[in-house]
From Swiss-Prot:
Enzyme nomenclature, EC number: 2.5.1.27
Protein name, entry field: Adenylate dimethylallyltransferase
Keywords assigned: Cytokinin biosynthesis, Plasmid, Transferase
UniProt xrefs under InterPro entries: P-loop_NTPase, Tzs
GO terms of biological process kind: cytokinin biosynthetic process
GO molecular function terms attached to this record: AMP dimethylallyltransferase activity
Keyword Transferase: yes
Species, as recorded: Ralstonia nicotianae (strain ATCC BAA-1114 / GMI1000)
Entry's family note: Belongs to the isopentenyl transferase family.
Pfam family, one: IPT
Entries under SUPFAM superfamilies matching the protein: P-loop containing nucleoside triphosphate hydrolases (SSF52540)
Gene label: tzs
Reaction(s) the record says it catalyses: dimethylallyl diphosphate + AMP = N(6)-(dimethylallyl)adenosine 5'-phosphate + diphosphate
Length: 238
């Protein structure tokens, strides 16, 4: 019997993780994250890796574990890693949940004919809401990233800790969220080694800039998405 593949995808802040966790609990299936940046464990906050408490005991796996200095895994490599993981899991699981928002990876899957033979698909695309609703959710997420609970690291801590290694600079400058913080610091001549000390007004400005960046990225993802091919067998058609 072919493995059942649930594909949950959509833009950042649209609730993919919550949906995948709920489905994992009801189906008893593991989740494989399709987010290429989440492969970098040093970027857990900025990439939106869910915490253990958010996972509610469900199983979640990343495409690989990678240091920031090596750069974000390419879409082509991520596609092959995912193919390998699905092939391995298919021997022991009846269902798998593929969740994420990397349109580059999803488009690489769409272009790869091998996915037509991998299993039965159930597709759940989360649409981008209107700008007001999206920005409200994005602001909430960014605010939590900039002001984490006591004792927990935030995105500023991640950036400050990684910036001491020059080989990380170009990688961080190319990732949503970190990019805006770096631009802000450069414009105001704030050393990154002191970025965790910025005042509430600076954080409020960053919340708006990063939320806007997320919105623009979400629109770009919608434009770039190629569309699921008819050759992917739907579970309802099996």
């Amino acid at each position: 019997m072919p493995v059942r593949l649930y594909l949950i995808w959509g833009a950042t802040t649209t609730g993919k993780t919550a949906q995948s966790v709920a489905l994992a609990r009801s189906a008893g299936a593991p989740v494989i994250s399709l987010d290429r940046v989440q492969c970098c464990h040093e970027l857990a906050v900025g990439s939106g890796r869910p915490s253990p408490s958010e996972l509610l005991g469900t199983r979640r796996e990343y495409l690989c574990e990678r240091e920031v200095s090596r750069g974000v895994v390419s879409a082509a490599e991520a596609n092959q890693l995912l193919l390998d993981k699905v092939a391995r899991y298919a021997t022991q699981e009846r269902a798998l949940i593929l969740e994420g928002g990397s349109v580059s990876l999803i488009n690489a899957m769409i272009r790869d004919a091998r996915w037509s033979e991998r299993g039965e698909w159930i597709l759940r695309r989360i649409p981008v809401p209107g700008r007001a609703a999206f920005m409200a959710a994005a602001r909430k997420r960014v605010r939590e990233m900039l002001d984490p609970p006591p004792g927990q690291a935030g995105i500023l801590d991640e950036l400050q800790g990684l910036w001491g290694y020059p080989r990380n600079h170009a990688v961080l400058e190319d990732i949503d969220g970190y990019r805006q913080i770096i631009r802000y610091a450069n414009a105001l001549q704030v050393p990154i080694c002191r970025i965790t000390s910025i005042d509430p007004n600076a954080k409020a400005l960053l919340i708006e800039r990063i939320a806007q960046e997320y919105w623009e990225h979400a629109l770009w993802q919608e434009q770039e998405f190629l569309g699921i091919p008819a050759s992917w067998m739907r579970a309802d058609d099996a």
